[in-house]
């Protein structure tokens, strides 16, 4: 079987981590850079990362915030991500591009190759610059009607109608 390489980019509030993985999930190479917290600077960083690699079979992004139809909404701890659609931006590369919430990506990765391998029902919680999570039920990633099921960063912390105390905005494992 021919080895195919994929670029995986983890967008975080502190760092952007990236790796080349083969189709078996083995890391071929990886690195990280400090996150820039404005849209223009951030997109320049992503452009430079992608420009390093040729012959990719696909690119996967995981990011905080709501992700629906490969578009990031709200951006969680990185609000400047709101509205970014990597498929539109990198369409000329002619490779599949996937975008997923970072908490959901963590549970999928653990279920594929990690400590939750092959479990039909499992959950993961991520602690970083923000909080995140994902849930797998009956072997399927739980998405929900608003594409945010299992993302603990969007959990309300009070019963007020308007709640500015949402877990992902108020708490950070980095700050603990």
Predicted features by range, described:
Residues 2-63:
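Conserved phosphate-binding loops in N-terminal lobes of ATP-dependent enzymes
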Residues 10, 102, 128:
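Active-site glycine-centered loops adjacent to acidic/histidine catalytic or metal-binding residues
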């Amino acid at each position: 079987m021919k080895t195919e390489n994929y670029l995986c980019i983890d967008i975080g509030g502190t760092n952007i981590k990236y790796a080349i993985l083969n189709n078996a999930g083995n890391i071929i190479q990886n690195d990280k850079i400090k996150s820039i917290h404005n849209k223009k600077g951030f997109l320049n960083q992503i452009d430079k990362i992608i420009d390093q690699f040729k012959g990719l079979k696909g690119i996967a992004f995981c990011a905080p915030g709501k992700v629906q139809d490969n578009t990031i909404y709200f951006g969680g701890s990185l609000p400047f991500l709101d509205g970014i659609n990597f498929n539109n931006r990198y369409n000329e590369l002619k490779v599949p591009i996937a975008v997923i919430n970072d908490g959901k990506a963590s549970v999928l990765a653990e279920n594929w190759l990690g400590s939750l391998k092959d479990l039909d029902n499992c959950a993961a919680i991520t602690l970083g610059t923000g909080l995140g999570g994902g849930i797998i039920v009956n072997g399927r990633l739980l998405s929900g009607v608003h594409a945010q099921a299992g993302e603990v960063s969007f959990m309300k912390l009070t019963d007020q109608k308007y709640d500015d105390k949402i877990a992902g905005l108020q708490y950070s494992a980095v700050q603990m």
